[in-house]
């Protein structure tokens, strides 16, 4: 390993990427978590919408349930049924229902997102290590990982929210990836994901960040739904997603993972000029 001493700016190149899973590399539209959360709340008699589920997307799944229970709309529906707003015991109960449902849903949504394998080829060809972070827990990833591998995708490092003290937006999964990959400084790493939580995670870790708009949770459309959408409507929706990501601090926004290699080249140019995230 080449030793870098921080007595001068790091001038490149990019050494690693940390990729999200659902909505970024697999599961176009990030459908698996949405299905599982809706079904888990339905078991308690509480109806929630896909748009409500997508709001906190990217968080550790327990934190996601907690965030959903804290929504005024969901909290009010819960109060109407049970005479009180949901408490921490309720969060744990719903999360307990969510885990097996999520495992089943993940298994049904393991297709690779178009453009991933060419991007992986670029990373490999340029000596860029591939790490991953996810709001999924280890049991969920134990189902997803072999299915992705059969389709040709096997990252060098897989870090789950259950592997670290706190999930996104805390940077600990990014730190664990850097350790597992033996990569530093952190400005040599690029975090790529499809949620605001991904972007905040990368920024908090001191990494470059790329938001993925078209295949991700914020847009929230399957490929078939995307194809059926009028072009003007799609452009407007993508512009809104891009705006949200840039407001959150993303350095770059692309439509899908296949566009990331050209952004890596741009980041290499910025690093060579002494720029940092």
Curated annotation (Swiss-Prot):
Domain of life from the UniProt record: Bacteria
Family: Belongs to the HAD-like hydrolase superfamily. PhnX family.
GO molecular function terms noted in the UniProt entry: metal ion binding; phosphoglycolate phosphatase activity; phosphonoacetaldehyde hydrolase activity
Lineage: Bacteria, Pseudomonadati, Thermodesulfobacteriota, Syntrophobacteria, Syntrophobacterales
Alphabetized CDD domains for the sequence: HAD_PHN (cd02586)
UniProtKB keywords: Hydrolase, Magnesium, Metal-binding, Schiff base
Co-factor(s): Mg(2+)
GO CC list: cytosol
NCBIfam families: phosphonatase
HAMAP family in the record: PhnX
Function: Involved in phosphonate degradation.
Protein name, per record: Phosphonoacetaldehyde hydrolase
PANTHER family: PHOSPHOGLYCOLATE PHOSPHATASE, PHOSPHONOACETALDEHYDE HYDROLASE
Residue positions binding Mg(2+): 20, 22, 194
Active-site residues, record numbering mapped to chain: 20 (nucleophile), 61 (schiff-base intermediate with substrate)
Cofactor note: Binds 1 Mg(2+) ion per subunit.
Reactions catalysed according to its record: phosphonoacetaldehyde + H2O = acetaldehyde + phosphate + H(+)
């Amino acid at each position: 390993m080449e030793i870098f001493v921080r007595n001068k700016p790091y001038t490149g190149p990019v050494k690693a990427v940390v990729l999200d899973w659902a909505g970024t590399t697999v599961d176009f539209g990030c459908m698996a978590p949405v299905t599982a959360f809706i079904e888990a709340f339905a078991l308690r008699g509480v109806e929630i919408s896909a748009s409500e589920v997508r709001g906190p997307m990217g968080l550790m799944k327990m934190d996601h349930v907690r965030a959903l229970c804290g929504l005024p709309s969901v909290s009010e529906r819960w109060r109407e049924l049970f005479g009180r707003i949901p408490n921490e015991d309720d969060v744990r109960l719903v999360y307990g229902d969510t885990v097996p449902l999520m495992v089943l849903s993940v298994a049904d949504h393991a297709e690779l997102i178009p453009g991933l394998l060419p991007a992986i080829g670029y990373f490999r060809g340029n000596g860029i290590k591939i790490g991953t972070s996810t709001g999924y827990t280890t049991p969920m990833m134990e189902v997803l990982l072999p299915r992705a591998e059969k389709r040709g995708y096997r990252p060098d490092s897989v870090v789950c929210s259950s592997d670290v003290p706190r999930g996104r937006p805390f940077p600990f999964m990014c730190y664990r990836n850097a350790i597992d990959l033996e990569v530093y400084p952190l400005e040599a790493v690029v975090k790529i994901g499809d949620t605001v939580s991904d972007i905040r995670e990368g920024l908090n870790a001191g990494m470059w960040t790329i938001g993925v708009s078209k295949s991700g949770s914020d847009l929230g459309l399957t490929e078939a739904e995307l194809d059926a959408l009028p072009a003007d409507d799609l452009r407007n929706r993508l512009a809104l997603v891009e705006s949200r990501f840039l407001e959150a601090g993303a350095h770059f926004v692309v439509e899908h993972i296949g566009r990331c290699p050209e952004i890596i080249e741009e980041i290499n140019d910025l690093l060579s000029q002494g720029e940092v995230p």
